[in-house]
């Protein structure tokens, strides 16, 4: 299957640069791939798509202020590090700029030396493994020195960093937000729960690979990035009970889908408590094992996320829905509007 099969025209002005004032006031395109229907709505009406006894599954990861600006103590050259994932202890995989100046043994200081990084390994594409040294608690030091790592297609400064977090963000570790969840308010979640829908949380720490375009023509040659996930026993039991009672598992976003389908694939369709690393690539031809419906934002052309949605709803219908969204001036990407896929 060719990457170009998932391309579409997207006017640049439809790429949302800032969040709307109210999280749940974004537009919602409701599509049903069996009936081949599309309905224009608003996000706070997502409650009408959920039935008593369903489970709404959300990713409770929290975005780290993962962009650090520092300098080399020997040359005073400026350095930017973007934290990708914690590999062990105080060691992190990072994206470094300018990478060519950062060889094994190089040091970088941040915040007058309150945080120091030593390069201990060189990876491809500007990647490095660094070991941090600091006084106190790492996350507190990071909160004081780091900046929120907004996606490369957002050029406006974010006034309130919490708008790039979901209202239920809890587990620190992501380099990017699980953006399908940004539309939910605490009030909307209370109403959904009052309707008899089970609110279930899992964790997948989103890496920067989520923004990387597919660089090969043949999808079979694409290497997916790896991300850490976790599902608790309590959450797994709730999902098993929902399935057994005939309810649906409704995922919020592609990160929740990838976690649930990783677990479903590992346990032959059963839902078990689990944690580990996943590089699952869901593309047309994939048979879904756990997820019955989902919400998601509008994604980049030729991205693995468009391929995932196409695997569920069919490529032609998804691209038709995207053309409709462009015609109706839906807002795209992280701060954009959403779709609900039945």
Curated annotation (Swiss-Prot):
Keyword annotations from UniProtKB, A to Z: Cytoplasm, Queuosine biosynthesis, S-adenosyl-L-methionine, Transferase
Any GO CC annotation of this UniProt entry: cytoplasm
Pathway the protein acts in: tRNA modification; tRNA-queuosine biosynthesis
Gene Ontology terms: biological process: queuosine biosynthetic process; tRNA wobble guanine modification
Enzyme Commission number: 2.4.99.17
Domain of life: Bacteria
InterPro entries, per the entry: QueA (IPR003699), QueA_dom1 (IPR042118), QueA_dom2 (IPR042119), QueA_sf (IPR036100)
Cysteine disulfide links: none
Record NCBIfam families: PRK00147.1, queA
General function of this protein: Transfers and isomerizes the ribose moiety from AdoMet to the 7-aminomethyl group of 7-deazaguanine (preQ1-tRNA) to give epoxyqueuosine (oQ-tRNA).
Assembly description: Monomer.
Family membership: Belongs to the QueA family.
Protein name: S-adenosylmethionine:tRNA ribosyltransferase-isomerase
The species this protein was found in: Streptococcus pyogenes serotype M1
